[in-house]
Amino acid sequence: DEARLSGHPVLPRMMTGHALNCRAMALRCAADVLHKPLADCRLIVLHLGGGGSARLFIGGKMVDGVRDDEWMFAPERMGGVSLQPLVAMCYSGAYTKQDIMDLIRGKGGLMAHLGTASAQEVEQRIADGDAHAKLVYDGMLYSCARAIGGLAAAADGRVDRIILTGGLAHSRYVTGYLTQKLSFIAPVEVMAGEFEL
């Protein structure tokens, strides 16, 4: 369907990443918070750990999503970047294919900007007055909020809840930032950790 189309037919969008935990959190929110079946809910779930993804559930089905190699970056993921500079890097002769793959997954995101993927370390640096750490961390969270805003548009603006899950949902800094950015769309529910079915 239209959610799987990209700008080129040989590169369809992939709907992978944290699907089990996102579905488990959607089911839990539907039952425990909204008191109705998932089939009757419109939910957006953001999973944020070392990587990240966001999923849109409508009618009990995962109908759209954003991976951490698309719009948003994460502690170890590069996220959405301008393609022309990336292609130039690939053909510069300075990087192997594995080097590029490592930059995308494992050495991207907070790791690339700050030399660590530890949210606790970054938050301590922010508390100690590191303005660059705050800029990068807030930039990562901004990219997550932007991705969720896109999924809200795909849901025609009708969303019952936005669920924050994954390891970073334990952080008050993270949940506070995202709640401030997203609560105009729908109430934000924090369901930290992972509970895969």
Residue ranges with predicted function:
Residues G52-F57:
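Short beta-strand scaffold segments in enzyme catalytic cores
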Residues C144, S171-R172:
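Claisen-condensing/thiolase-fold acyl-transfer catalytic domains that form or cleave C-C bonds
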Residues D102, G106-G157:
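Adenine-nucleotide phosphate-binding core of ATP-dependent small-molecule kinases
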Residues S6-L43, G50-G51, V63-A119:
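Glycine-rich phosphate-binding loop plus the immediately following alpha-helix
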